[in-house]
């Protein structure tokens, strides 16, 4: 038996803004979009092999208090050309939370925030270098 992440869900303030953001930044494709009861809207976007579920409960919904939420801390998005992806996202106005860094040889990361406040991690990991860093205990995060 095998497992894989099928989708990740983000609660949106404005589903239109969120769809536009993921299309512009990552070339996401809208696979399904529905209006559901109780002013709820839902959209499934495909980015690579992963589905992103966007949910908008409308203006009457109360936001989740982040101090009481212990769930997902960020969503990792992989790339095979870190420098080109970073330049592309920067040119598109990405809200980076710092500069790119290399926590171990062969691993490059940078964090950014999407319009709803969710944290995204742009990552490029060389599998052999990553495993070597784990084996040697040199991963410094």
Annotate each PLM feature.
Residues 1-5, 29-76, 87-113, 126-141:
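Vicinal oxygen chelate
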Residues 9-11, 76-78:
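Short hydrophobic/aromatic beta-strand micro-patches
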Residues 18-23, 89, 117:
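Conserved active-site tyrosine of GNAT-family acetyltransferases
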Residues 21-22, 26, 96:
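Conserved hydrophobic/aromatic "anchor" residues
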Residues 82-86:
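Short, conserved charged micro-motifs
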Residues 122:
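Short glycine-/small-residue motifs
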């Amino acid at each position: 038996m095998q497992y894989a992440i099928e989708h990740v869900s983000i609660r949106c303030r404005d589903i239109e803004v969120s769809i536009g953001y993921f299309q512009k930044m990552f070339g996401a494709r809208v696979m399904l979009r529905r209006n559901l009861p109780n002013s709820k809207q839902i959209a499934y976007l495909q980015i690579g092999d992963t589905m992103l579920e966007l949910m908008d409960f409308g203006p009457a919904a109360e936001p989740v208090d982040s101090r009481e939420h212990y769930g997902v801390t960020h969503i990792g998005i992989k790339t095979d050309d870190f420098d080109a992806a970073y330049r592309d996202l920067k040119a598109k106005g990405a809200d980076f939370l710092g500069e790119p860094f290399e926590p171990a040889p062969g691993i490059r990361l940078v964090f950014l925030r999407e319009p709803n406040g969710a944290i995204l991690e742009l990552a490029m990991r060389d599998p052999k270098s990553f495993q070597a860093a784990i084996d040697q205990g040199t991963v410094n995060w």
